Design a protein with these regions (language model features):
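N-terminal secretory signal peptides
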Residues: 1-15
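N-terminal export leaders
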Residues: 15-30
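N-terminal cap/lid segment of alpha/beta-hydrolase-fold proteins
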Residues: 39-70
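Short beta-strand element of the alpha/beta-hydrolase
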Residues: 74-83
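Gly/Ser-rich "nucleophile elbow"/oxyanion-hole loop immediately N-terminal to the catalytic nucleophile
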Residues: 121-161, 290
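Primarily recognizes the serine-hydrolase "nucleophile elbow" in alpha/beta-hydrolase
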Residues: 145-207
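Short beta-strand/loop motif that positions the catalytic acidic residue
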Residues: 211, 217-219
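C-terminal catalytic histidine-bearing segment of alpha/beta-hydrolase fold enzymes
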Residues: 244-291
């Protein structure tokens, strides 16, 4: 189910896949990717309070990267849902970008129970041993716990937004269909349709009528992993839903972009479309009261 997305993120040049996975979750991330892309964005932490925190979710402790303006409270909240490779330097950087704009941004490690991605020697092994074993139900519970944590630690849950990328883009749609506290959501190249199983019993387009927050979907027209037909069907289901959140939702397709066009650390990065998508995302959150 995830192979095209994975292939689109892995450059077609010789390099160690073990090194890539380890670097993605570790401190040597930048060193591993800078030779691939000189456009990698690094946002400093000046004026910010950044840390890894522990969030209690059921019987588990879920680590999360958190960034917010230093010394501030009662902040709007953005939950950042990681891509297929987990919480790595790019996801942390996105949190800092939001924090620079005045948000409490937090990215929980939604693979925490299933294992450490850096321990797997290949992308295929990572998918088989970790990603495929993460049930949607667990993800929703951990995201709910993250929201509660933010509300008790300086966040204003009346101004709650969620955004996610790749694997996390799909989860963004699902969470916006689940949690009534979400004011707005932005899903970056997340699947809206696909195979179902015990771990993923339904897809976003199955529950479009249950959408509780206006959601902006940002997609690439050349994304081999997400068909334009599935996006057209999602638009149709949103239009037919009749709810305000569904009516206000929007799907934008960048014709010349592929999957992961926002991932500035990969060759898939398309700067013009990434910049436009970021501007749209920030405007979306502000328009819907997440500021």
């Amino acid at each position: 189910m995830l192979k095209p997305e994975v292939d689109s993120l892995v450059p077609h040049v010789p390099f160690s896949r073990r090194k890539f996975v380890q670097a993605a979750l570790g401190g040597t991330f930048a060193a591993a990717v800078l030779p691939v892309s000189a456009q990698t964005i690094t946002t400093d932490a000046a004026g910010l309070d950044v840390d890894t925190v522990q969030i209690r979710s059921g019987d588990a402790s879920v680590p999360a990267y958190r960034a917010q303006p230093d010394g501030k409270s009662n902040l709007p909240v953005i939950v950042v849902i990681h891509e297929v490779f987990g919480v790595h330097a790019h996801i942390a950087d996105i949190c800092r970008r939001f924090a620079k704009l005045g948000y409490l941004a937090i990215a929980p490690d939604l693979y925490a129970r299933q294992g450490d991605p850096s321990k797997h020697a290949s992308i295929q092994e990572l998918i088989a041993q970790v990603v495929s074993k993460v049930p949607d139900r667990q993800v929703i519970e951990d995201l709910d716990a993250t929201v509660r944590w933010a509300g008790k630690n300086g966040g204003d849950l009346s101004r709650l937004g969620v955004t996610g990328f790749c694997w996390g883009g799909r989860q963004t749609w699902l969470f916006a269909e689940h949690n009534p506290h979400v004011r707005a959501a932005v899903a970056w190249y997340g699947k809206v349709a696909g195979e179902t199983n015990e771990m993923t019993p339904f897809n976003p387009d199955d529950h479009a009528a249950q959408l509780k927050a206006p959601t902006l979907g940002l997609y690439g027209g050349k994304d081999d992993s997400i068909s334009q037909r599935s996006l057209a069907r999602m638009r149709e289901r949103l239009a037919a839903a009749g709810t305000q959140a569904a009516r206000e939702s929007e799907i934008v397709v960048y014709p010349d972009a592929g999957h992961a066009f926002f991932a500035d650390y990969r060759p898939s990065y398309v700067k013009a479309d990434a910049d436009d998508g970021w501007k749209r995302a920030i405007a979306w959150f502000r328009h819907h009261g997440v500021m």
